[in-house]
Amino acid sequence: MALRQCAIYGKGGIGKSTTTQNLVSALAEMGKKVMIIGCDPKADSTRLILHAKAQNTIMEMAAEVGSVEDLELEDVLQIGYGGVRCAESGGPEPGVGCAGRGVITAINFLEEEGAYEEDLDFVFYDVLGDVVCGGFAMPIRENKAQEIYIVCSGEMMAMYAANNISKGIVKYAKSGSVRLAGLICNSRQTDREDELIIALADKLGTQMIHFVPRDNIVQRAEIRRMTVIEYDPTCKQANEYRTLANKVVNNKLFVVPTPVTMDELEELLMEFGIMDVEDETIIGKTAAEEAAATA
């Protein structure tokens, strides 16, 4: 099959790295050849695949030897569970320089050194937070990733981030082949969450490709620095990630999204009862003040 390059975006803390690594593990279990590139200075995009605290990053190693040109591919590329190839871009120390530059430098280095081998089926870019500008947009801005998956939940800020990321995709879709491939709902167990994300996906012109239920086994596996697929391959949650992997493999719905306004997003939340119908009299009032007013 032709190489498919996918970028995973979403609100910070939504579970992008965990979801990506479990998805990648499921793909590897299916026999797919996969490379995962962490595009986050935290360098936590490959730890579950490698059973490691954090992989040494390309930028760290480049600083140690002098420059990225002094590195060899085998220095930065590690092989983890299921033969998954792992690399972390890294970035400068906090408060110094532009971390986005690390993403650009790392991806260019991997390309030049032949990391994108012919036998690869998938490359996944696990990207910092919901940043879709500058260096962190490099996987979509430079047409590296054609498929964008957004990890979200039924929480307002996660949906807000998904909408913002969609705006970024629209911008870069005009000059390249990048497309939104779907929303992955990583459940936070909010009310009517699956219905809400399906409705949001519909407004964005895309699909909720899968609803990943919340299960504490994910955290138990993480404590052991393992994916659920490897830690307990017979559990229900492992099958959820396998289902997601199958849906990604067979996905054909790649769209230029249609972002909504903030008012439209709030209307959607009101429709599903997540946000109260707008009432100017409650703005800025504490719970105690509201209780006193209704007593």
From Swiss-Prot:
Classification via CDD domains: NifH
Protein name: Nitrogenase iron protein
Entry-linked InterPro entries: NifH/chlL_CS (IPR030655), NifH/frxC (IPR000392), Nitrogenase_Fe_NifH (IPR005977), P-loop_NTPase (IPR027417)
HAMAP family per the UniProt record, alphabetical: NifH
Keyword Phosphoprotein: no
Name of the gene: nifH
Transmembrane segments: none
Source organism of the structure: Tolumonas auensis (strain DSM 9187 / NBRC 110442 / TA 4)
Keyword Iron: yes
Family statement drawn from the similarity comment of this UniProt entry: Belongs to the NifH/BchL/ChlL family.
Cofactor(s) this protein requires: [4Fe-4S] cluster
